[in-house]
Design a protein with these regions (language model features):
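Acidic, metal-coordinating catalytic cores used for nucleic-acid/nucleotide bond scission
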Residues: 266, 289-299, 313-315, 448-449
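Basic, amphipathic alpha-helical segments enriched in Lys/Arg and hydrophobic/aromatic residues
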Residues: 445-468
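Short, flexible loop/turn motifs enriched in small residues
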Residues: 16-21, 236-242, 397-399, 425-426
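Short helix/loop capping segments that flank catalytic or ligand/cofactor-binding pockets
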Residues: 32-33, 147-153, 163-165, 220-223, ...
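Dynamic "connector" segments at or just before major functional cores
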Residues: 1-212, 216-222, 246-264, 499-537
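Electropositive, glycine- and tryptophan-enriched low-complexity nucleic-acid-binding patches
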Residues: 238-280
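An anionic, glycine-rich sequence signature occurring as long contiguous blocks
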Residues: 240, 260, 306-419, 489-537
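Short amphipathic alpha-helical "interface-anchor" segments enriched in bulky aromatics
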Residues: 415-443
Length: 537
């Protein structure tokens, strides 16, 4: 049976714990050891907040679980919320929000989310107040931090959200294990996407045609990533990979489904399984795909699915042959174009691949090719000098050479690359799962937590897309960075049941009024929680 091992616990005159730490410890039977047993720390509970007289239960500020109650007799954890009677003194763990906080950015974002219908989607998917408040706190942080490294608890503490989302313990937001595990549950994923799809279908009855996207692997520098698998997809050496599959609405590019899969299961059967899951769960049709080279085989090339994919550099595909075909033309200006700050060579061909006539788009990214060549000549000069002339020619293009294969209608090389990148770049939003995981101990890199992080990123992406749509509809040139920067100058202070806003600057007022909103003189907190956020308490 486990027990709580407390260390250096000190109490004040009233008996309240003022310092100390604790761990959950198991006793194991070990034949031949002293006392035939050995103690093993199962989990560190962190700082002691309250501890029962018998030492068998208490409240702790866990580095991985946040504020939590642990009972050794039942070996169970329970979250601690404001007003649930667990703590005798809640003032230290649920401090009152600051009197003077930033209001403009959070109020503008919440106004956009309400008018766009996303708040209603979230209320439908997460009907419990505690779940919705915690989700909104993390959503505000992810969108408003705009690339900065400010932590969630710090941003919320100095924002009007600390008053509007009073049911959330601000210190618990720093390492919110419970939130990401709850978001990683399949029920949360299905509830959100069903609610989102219902809202999109209500706004546009023709909604229902989607694109399957899996063009690049997730970052593989997490050694303990539970999805990682050793794999190769025909473009380079084998590596440990996990992959993110997205299903995007064709018209808006909004994600309506995702899967995280090991890198070694990438093939047409994975595509078929995801199509079936999406159809059965959401009632939408996946009619096209943007794919990495690992998916390309005879079944895909000869099938009915419309696709755009990278050609693998393996037997049966004219990868190297296409290089020899275009080599004399690579430096001709008529085939050059620029995308994303890179100069490209691009040509279109129609060739038979795996018995099926296909469109091939051959490219050389001049910047990437030059960088790779420079690295080879610097790091391995003897190897480069010993190459044959034809191999040196190939080395000059190798780092930037790639081929796209498609059965869609013919496009220009620039158009095909735009079609590929426009879908692929949506994935890049989710490649930073490691940003959250770096804040957590290795024990927190679980499959459930990672799925929860991806779902959270999907929700944040939908929110940012709604912001961009609102700005575009208003005909304004403002970026999200501009919106949050200019409106964060608007401060407020608490006066009884209301937040009283200061006089906004001219630029702040322009942002609100330009998007169709008025800057309120004051906000009744209870009414705002009830009418705007849809909270029942």
């Amino acid at each position: 049976m486990p027990f709580i091992k407390a260390q250096k616990v000190r109490r004040d005159e009233s008996g309240r714990v003022v310092s100390g730490s604790a761990s959950v410890v198991d006793t194991e039977y070990v034949p031949g050891a002293r006392y035939h047993s050995r103690q093993r720390v199962r989990e560190r509970l962190g700082r002691v907040v309250e501890l029962a007289e018998d030492g068998r239960s208490g409240v702790f500020r866990s580095p991985t679980r946040g504020l939590v109650r642990y009972d050794a007799d039942t070996d169970s954890f329970e979250p601690v919320e404001r007003g649930d009677g667990t703590l005798d003194d809640e003032s230290s763990e649920f401090p009152e929000p600051s009197a003077h906080v930033v209001a403009g950015d959070s109020l503008l974002l919440l106004s956009i989310l309400e008018s766009s219908g996303l708040l209603a989607v979230l209320r439908s998917a997460f009907p419990k107040d505690a779940e919705l408040e915690r989700l909104l706190a993390h959503l505000l942080h992810s969108v408003l931090r705009d690339g900065s490294r400010v932590s969630c608890d710090d941003l919320v503490a100095r924002s009007a959200a600390s008053h509007l989302l009073a049911g959330v313990s601000v210190p618990s937001l720093r390492s919110d294990s419970a939130y990401f595990h709850a978001m990683g549950d399949d029920r949360a994923k299905v509830a959100f996407f069903r609610s989102l799809v219902d809202a999109m279908r209500a706004a546009d009855p023709s909604f229902g045609t989607c694109c399957y996207v899996d063009s690049t692997p997730l970052p593989n520098d997490l050694a303990d990533n539970p999805f990682n698998a050793f794999s190769s997809h025909g473009l380079g050496e084998a590596a440990v990979q996990s992959r993110l599959v997205l299903v995007l609405d064709d018209a808006t590019g909004i994600p309506v489904w995702y899967e995280v899969i090991p890198g070694n299961v990438v093939d047409v059967s994975t595509l078929a399984r995801v199509r079936e899951d999406v159809g059965a769960t959401l009632g939408v049709t996946v009619s096209s795909a943007v794919l990495d080279a690992g998916y390309v085989n005879r079944e895909l090339v000869g099938g009915d699915m419309r696709y755009l994919a990278r050609m693998p550099a393996r037997r049966g595909y004219p990868f190297k042959t296409m290089w020899h075909d275009v080599k004399p033309q690579v430096n001709r200006g008529k085939y050059a174009f620029v995308r994303g700050g890179h100069a490209y060579f691009g040509r279109h061909f129609v060739r038979e691949v795996q018995g099926t006539e296909s469109h091939l788009y051959v490219y050389v990214d001049k910047e990437n090719a030059l960088s790779c060549l420079r690295q080879t000549m610097t790091d391995r000069p003897e190897e480069y000098e010993a190459m044959l002339e034809r191999d040196k020619d190939w080395e000059q293009a190798r780092g930037g050479f790639f081929v796209l294969i498609s059965n869609m209608d013919e496009m220009t090389p620039a158009g095909a690359l735009d079609a590929y990148f426009s879908r692929m770049e949506v994935e890049q939003v989710f490649k930073t799962a490691k940003d959250h995981l770096r804040l957590l101990p290795i024990a927190k890199w679980t499959e459930t937590a990672m799925r929860g992080k991806v779902l959270h990123d999907v929700i944040c992406t939908v929110a940012v897309l709604r912001v961009r749509k609102a700005v575009a509809a208003a005909g304004r040139p403002w970026s999200p960075t501009d919106l949050w920067g200019k409106t964060s100058s608007l401060m407020c202070f608490r006066n009884g049941p209301s937040l009283v806003l200061e006089t906004p600057s001219r630029q702040c007022r322009q942002r609100f009024e330009g998007l169709g909103y008025k800057v309120p003189a004051k906000v009744d907190v209870a009414a705002y929680r009830r009418d705007v956020l849809g909270l029942r308490s």
